[in-house]
Amino acid sequence: MFVTKPYDRLHAQEYALAFALKRNALFPDYTGIGGDCTNFVSQCLLAGCCEMNYTPTYGWYYISPKERAPAWTGVQYLYNFLTQNTATGPFAKEVRASEAELCDVIQLGNRSVGFYHTLIITGFERNTFLVSAHSDDAKNRPLSSYNYQRIRFLHIEGVRFEMPSAENCFTALMQQQSILAEDAADGAEAATEEETELRAPFVPLQLEPESEERREDSDRT
């Protein structure tokens, strides 16, 4: 049985603004091999929900460059996951622009290739949204400055989980430290053995070099 918790929009916003113009060392940069936009927005969503979905193929998770769900980096895959997810992790519905809120997701497209770019709302200015993104990097850029033929808004309704996480991943993400459950467990075990009340630090992920071949499930831009 799942429990629903709110999506922390302020945490997602803080993360997005902190890493819009730089990269978090925990994650690869797919800019040159398909695009980093959905990878970046997935990181922002994680900062606001701290809950992944490890369902093979159809889930939403990142463990390593070779162990990640298509939805973590693919524009259409992310849309499919968010709008169809009935298990753990964030879930969303497509809404009108007037219903979109802070740190909801925007996807842009055209008539020939479909949707190709993922952005996150990080502010509001007059009659437009301010968005942040990777590939091309943008921080609080007016949505009105983009050229596109199609647009859709995904409102994050909440986050489902089976049991509360022992750790809040937001601080670890901001400090570019590991958020993997096994790392946290190892740290807790070490602290117990040493009979100390100090929590063991997260262990940074050791990322493998990404292949230069374009991933089929990566972004288009």
Per-region residue spans from a language model:
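Short loop/turn segments at secondary-structure transitions that flank enzyme active sites
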Residues: A47, E51, N127, D137
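A broad, low-specificity signal marking well-ordered, structured residues that form hydrophobic/aromatic
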Residues: A12-E14, F129, I151
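Catalytic alpha/beta core of large soluble enzyme barrels
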Residues: S132-Y148
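A structural signal for short, hydrophobic beta-strand segments that form beta-sheets
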Residues: L10, I121, Q149-R150
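Low-complexity, Gly/Ser/Thr/Pro-rich intrinsically disordered linker/tail segments
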Residues: N147-T221
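Short, solvent-exposed loop/turn and secondary-structure capping segments
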Residues: Y54-T57, T118, L143
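...with weaker cross-activation on analogous glycine-rich loops/strands in unrelated enzymes
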Residues: Y61-H134
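N-terminal capping segments
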Residues: M1-T73
